[in-house]
Amino acid sequence: MDQLLPPAPLLDAARFELAIRRLADSLGHGTDRSMFRGAGQEYEQSRPYQAGDAVKAIDWRITARTGRLHVKEYEALRRVPVWLLVDTSASMTVGSRRPTKYEAAVCTAGGLALACLGRMRPVGCIGVGGRSLVVRPTLSRLATLGWLHRLRRYRLDEPTDFAASARLLEPLIAERSLVIVLSDLHDPTAAARLARIAQEHDVCLLVFRDPAERGLGAGILRAREAETGRALTTTGRFPTRRAEERLAALRGAGIDGLVLDTDRPSTARLRLFFSRRRPLAGRRP
């Protein structure tokens, strides 16, 4: 049975849109050299001056070194598309407190999407779970808000199928793209598939973590896994390091990422993370 994300912190539809717009403004501020950069120009080389060249294009450093006028040539950058892979599985929707991992992921996806649109970067989305959600990258704000509102609905029994979602994505990406994955990495098949995608595209990973996954108090803990129903018994003092361990393993495949705890502010960390990433056009294929 489908359920709607609870009233707070996403509130109603209008307040949900307001929240992600504010996040988009915060993420986009001061990050023009990061993932949010879209169309523009990139320096390619300098060549000798020719009659008719603009004075503002003169490369004064090369001119001073050679004694001959040189001008800079620039290469136009394409509008590199962005794909958001949002984990919609049951493990994302269950948490020890609000917001859940899923609530945080949907809000973050919304902020990233609108920030990219503000920089003229087309954005698409694929739901990583049992539902059918595939939206090709677009510059349409209306279409983007449409799939964001679809993400507000969730199921408590939805499985993860990262492998199937990745197989679906691969033939859809005809050109080099930026792929941002928002997940808790509970699916063990995710690492291999992401490594394969990273061979052709720029991939980064945002891992959402519930406070309980950092470790509980003393004592024995009995629990049941939300998606598979598998029961387990563990000690509360043992912190869950799965997110960091899997993220560290993926770095070897050229995938960088960030662990986001749902009980801690994330906007500043996200802004810093993306501002420090090299633009996709400068990353090695």
What is each residue range found by the language model?
Residues M1-M35, Y43-D53, I62, G67, ...:
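Exposed, interaction-prone extracellular/peripheral surfaces
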Residues V55-A57:
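N-terminal juxtadomain amphipathic helix
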